[in-house]
Curated annotation (Swiss-Prot):
Its EC number is 3.6.-.-. ATP binds at K48, G49, G50, V51, G52, K53, T54, T55, E248, N275. SUPFAM superfamilies: P-loop containing nucleoside triphosphate hydrolases. This is ATPase ASNA1 homolog. It is an enzyme of class 3 (hydrolase). The active site is at D77. The keyword Chaperone does not apply. Homodimer. Its main location: cytoplasm. One of its GO terms (molecular function) is ATP binding. Belongs to the arsA ATPase family. The keyword Metal-binding does not apply.
Length: 379
């Protein structure tokens, strides 16, 4: 953690869209500024698997639907939990979510093979003349499909799109695609310039002028598209990332890793949602020792035995509760120390039931807008 932790201190104030300087910015412990920021077009929600990304992205989309003209919730997670979350079947076509007139959802295949017009086709002249490209740049075929997909998403007429992303590792691969495309297409463009004379001769010999021109057009189109996507990713007025985690070692570690990659790629990130947090009990404190003293004054053995059993169970529950609070506080303290000066950190409580269905997601979404102190345990 130490190396990544030391790198976090280098994150500049520019990560926040709302501040002119670190000193002047107050980082609220809610997502109000994210929801109220009407300039954003793309909001990515990511983190380790099983930390509540889908619940958080659905909740953000619901709140945005109250402020924006049209909202699309787009799942790139292979598990596609959005259908389960809303108890409604979604496909790779935008579908209106029940009870809304401006909130849509779609689930796309993360291989991108069925969701884009781009296909790697061996008979295609563009691909057959440069097979080395696909070997020299592993993942370029998926990156090209991703570029086509993002371009089609960019052309969608929604006010804002919320991306429910796959777990961290897959998300980092997606974030690397624009750089991979830039490198691969730069190689192609240089190759085209170097072989211009040879290709012209080939054109006259093979009578393939139209195919060569088509290849040039395709390279230029992909290059323009790649630059456009990267510019959109790196524009903090249009794109931001919301990190989701829970107060446990692996989740905090992956969050740190994700934030470092986002920082390296100049992608805005100024919100962290910490789910499954155990907050202090709101019920009145019960002094178990005092209860034990009072119990000794009761002469009835049956009542004493019943209360003794109850006190033992209470002690067990208290031990579990305190242990959990202490463990979580260790990681909440790390989160606060690492990111407290640069991020809106929103702690969400551990709930009694799973969050499924519109009513429960709506309630959860309201809680994202309520400020809550980071609950560090102290004896």
């Amino acid at each position: 953690m130490s190396k990544a932790g030391s790198d976090v201190s280098s994150i500049s104030c520019s990560l926040s869209l709302d501040s002119d300087s670190c000193e002047d910015e107050y980082y609220e412990t809610n997502l109000n500024k994210l929801i109220e920021n009407t300039s954003l077009n793309w909001i990515f929600v990511g983190g380790k698997g099983g930390v509540g990304k889908t619940t958080t992205s659905c909740s953000i989309a619901i709140q945005l639907a109250k402020k924006r003209e049209s909202v699309l919730l787009l799942s790139t997670d292979p598990a596609h939990n959005t259908s389960d979350a809303f108890n409604q079947k979604f496909t790779n076509k935008p579908t209106l979510i029940n009870s809304f007139d401006n909130l849509y959802c779609m689930e796309i295949d993360t291989t991108f093979s069925e969701d884009t017009a781009f296909k790697i086709n061996k008979s295609d002249f563009f691909n057959s003349i440069i097979p080395e490209l696909l070997q020299s740049f592993p993942g370029i075929d998926e990156a090209l499909c991703f570029a086509e997909l993002m371009q089609s998403i960019k052309n969608m007429k929604y006010s804002v799109i919320v991306f429910d992303t796959a777990p961290t590792g897959h998300t980092l691969r997606l974030l690397a695609f624009p750089d991979l495309l830039k490198k691969a297409l730069g190689y192609l463009i240089n190759l085209k310039e170097k072989l211009k004379g040879t290709l012209s001769m080939l054109q006259s010999l093979t009578n393939n002028e139209m195919e060569f021109e088509g290849m040039y057009d395709k390279i230029n189109h992909l290059n323009t598209m790649s630059i456009s996507i990267q510019e959109n990713f790196q524009n903090p007025l249009k794109t931001t990332f919301v990190c989701v985690c829970i107060p446990e070692f692996l989740s905090v570690y992956e969050t740190e890793r994700l934030i470092q990659e986002l920082t390296k790629k100049n992608i805005s990130c100024y919100n962290i949602v910490v789910n499954q947090v155990v907050f202090p009990l709101t019920s009145p404190d019960v002094n178990i020792e005092k209860c034990e003293k009072l119990l000794k004054q009761i002469k009835d053995t049956n009542i004493q035995n019943s209360f003794n059993s109850l006190i033992l169970k209470a002690k067990e529950l208290e031990d579990v509760y305190i242990s959990r609070r202490k463990l979580q506080s260790k990681y909440l303290t790390q989160i606060k120390n690492l990111y407290g000066n640069y991020f809106h950190i929103v702690c969400m409580p551990q709930l009694k039931t799973e969050i499924r269905g519109l009513d429960k997601i709506s309630n959860f979404s309201e809680m994202l807008l309520q400020s809550k102190d980071i609950p560090i345990y102290s004896t």
